[in-house]
């Protein structure tokens, strides 16, 4: 199965078979990600990181992934120091950076920016997050985490928090529909999952439940995927203040959880998971962040064609 020169824009572009292949590749590369083995798979390859929005885990895990495989990284640094501040449009930026690198990882605030960038690039584009639409590389690491810590087939999962603006849950919903998941959506009414995503799930015969209370579902699910309420996506700060503290995972809540429950979070968290949860067997979010390295290693290696 060849992924050479393949763009990674949306989970909708990948079949279940292809997703499993990428996860299998990540598993083979995990010892390299942990520093237990060395690899020069990306020797001679240059990976450009163009991040027009703040990022810690996505950007640094891509840097780690490239360097663990012997590749070199070009980093945009800050938008303020780039020609974007002079008025250069994204299409021209992509055309030029394509001449400097073998692959581009792009994060941009505009919905659909990654798909548009792929039209102008002469090298593969990996979407590191485009507006509130997609975050496929986060989804790959989420799937990898779930597979390692629980199971994918027929998973009972609750997604909670900002389901309206949260691009991580949008991508994850589609991917899990390929595995016959049972999905519970937990959010305030103001932050409900967009109807078009719910319709897509229903077309795939996925069982969906909606509620605004974690207490109602905590004993019924195998994975709880928490997300923060994204202040930067709210046009009205007052609306953010109304909903920011509506959902929180605490030790008291978890007294009613299944003992095998795993809690995931794409991070950063604000106050939606109490620090007391961090030391419990339920907490998987820090290991989840690490799994971003082997999964992104797999995507870099496959898209550049150094692994087939």
UniProtKB/Swiss-Prot annotation:
It catalyses: carbamoyl phosphate + L-aspartate = N-carbamoyl-L-aspartate + phosphate + H(+). GO terms for cellular component: cytosol. GO terms for molecular function: amino acid binding; aspartate carbamoyltransferase activity. Its EC number is 2.1.3.2. L-aspartate binds at residues 86, 167, 228. It comes from the Archaea. The keyword Transferase applies. Heterooligomer of catalytic and regulatory chains. HAMAP family: Asp_carb_tr (MF_00001). Catalyzes the condensation of carbamoyl phosphate and aspartate to form carbamoyl aspartate and inorganic phosphate, the committed step in the de novo pyrimidine nucleotide biosynthesis pathway. This is Aspartate carbamoyltransferase catalytic subunit. The lineage of its organism: Archaea, Methanobacteriati, Methanobacteriota, Stenosarchaea group, Methanomicrobia. The gene is pyrB.
């Amino acid at each position: 199965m060849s992924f050479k020169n393949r763009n990674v824009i949306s989970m909708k572009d990948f079949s279940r078979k292809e997703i499993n292949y990428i996860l299998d590749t990540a598993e083979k590369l995990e010892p390299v990600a942990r520093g237990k083995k060395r690899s020069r798979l990306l020797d001679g390859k240059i990976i450009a990181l163009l991040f027009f929005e703040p990022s810690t885990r996505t950007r640094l895990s891509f840097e780690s992934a490239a360097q663990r495989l012997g590749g070199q990284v070009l980093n945009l640094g800050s938008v303020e120091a780039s020609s974007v501040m002079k008025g250069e449009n994204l299409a021209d930026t992509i055309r030029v950076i394509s001449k400097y690198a073998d692959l581009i990882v792009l994060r941009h605030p505009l919905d659909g920016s990654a798909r548009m960038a792929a039209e102008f690039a002469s090298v593969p584009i990996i979407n590191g997050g485009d507006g509130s639409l997609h975050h496929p590389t986060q989804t790959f690491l989420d799937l990898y985490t779930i597979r390692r810590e629980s199971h994918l087939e027929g998973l009972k999962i609750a997604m909670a928090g900002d389901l309206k603006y949260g691009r991580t849950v949008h991508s994850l919903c589609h991917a899990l529909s390929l595995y016959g998941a049972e999905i519970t959506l937990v959010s305030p009414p103001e932050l409900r999952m967009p109807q078009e995503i719910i319709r897509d799930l229903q077309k795939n015969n996925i069982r969906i439940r909606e509620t605004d209370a974690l207490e109602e579902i905590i004993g019924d699910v195998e994975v709880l995927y928490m997300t923060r309420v994204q202040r930067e996506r709210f046009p009205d700060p007052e609306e953010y203040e109304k909903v920011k503290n509506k959902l929180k995972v605490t030790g008291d809540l978890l007294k009613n959880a299944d003992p095998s429950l795993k809690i995931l979070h794409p991070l950063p968290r604000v106050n939606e998971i109490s620090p007391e949860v961090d030391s419990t067997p339920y907490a998987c979010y820090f290991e989840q962040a690490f799994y971003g390295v082997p999964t992104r290693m797999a995507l870099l290696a496959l898209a550049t064609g150094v692994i087939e």
